[in-house]
Amino acid sequence: MLIRSLLIGDLDADSALWGRNLLKRHTWGQVDLPRLIEGGAALQMFTTVTKSPQGQNYARNAADAADNITLLALAQRWPAAAYDSLFARAMLQADRVLTAAAQSPQLTLIRSKTDLSSLLSQRADGHSIVGALLGTEGSHALDGELDNIDRLYAAGFRMMGLQHFFDNRLGGSLHGESQAGLTRF
């Protein structure tokens, strides 16, 4: 079967946002481990959604617009720190992925080239295993603190989007108000 010979990776899943068990099959939502394995996925980037401006669109979004994720955080009873800290939101979602990886030998966090090589070797030996990568949707997850890059890295993040739908301290988003490039931040 052709699909089993391909190296399939998906670079954007917001599944950790919703508080579902990533190890159990669901009939809704983006991904879960059983469906990833059935689809032959080798790599899944779990991107952390930390802010979604109300009225989000592809033309222009204000960074100071009311935030949809705050409402979700309240509804899901996230820890209080995640109500107003985008960094805390990223760490909460990362913890959900890390917890799932710790509970299943079929999901492994990719932090290094060695981890990736090990994953590929196991898959070549016929093991059903998926590599999990952590990333942010926008550098606003830094909460304006460059030291948070090191903290995200230590937690397992290996990708950080610069902007996502609105401007932040690092620069202007294609969908933001300033339409500017990178800042000195």
What are these language model-derived features?
Residues 179-185:
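Alpha-helix-loop-beta-strand connector modules within alpha/beta enzyme cores
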Residues 1-179:
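N-terminal hydrophobic targeting/anchoring segments and the immediately downstream early-domain regions
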